[in-house]
Amino acid sequence: MLFRSSAAICGAVVALAISVTIARSEIAAVHSSAVVNTASGDAIVGAASTYNPFRPGWREGGPNTASGERYDPSVWAAAIKTSLRQKFGGVQYGVRPKYALVEAVGKKVIVKINDVGPLTPGRIIDLNERAMRYFDPSLQLGVIHDVIVKPLFGDYWIPGPVG
């Protein structure tokens, strides 16, 4: 009986350590604001919405995006307005996706631009579920206004929060 209890405690401690590590990696910024700001292009200001071809919380792989990747709500990704796609590297099937800096509500995040949209007039970017949860953890807003989106030069950015 003692062995089962100690094994359960060890398992719980390991699970806690893993969850703390994951939580820290969510918060820890890989790129500094200064580096990102010097590597970014002209800003576009507008509204951002969230998209998921299924329903919020769905974790299965979705349909293919414009870049050919499968939609994944767990990565830092977004779809840029079709009329802006050239500014963000073309977003074409089989072409390496480009990256953008998205700023809103006092936060910054780097997202991979791997799809085109939104189709709703007045919106410039559709954030996937993970990126939108960074700005709106409850997903209650649906749309965030006064979002600043800047294309990032180069192909080797690590998507996620910017410090």
Residue positions per predicted region:
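Hydrophobic helical h-region of N-terminal Sec-dependent signal peptides
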Residues: 10-18
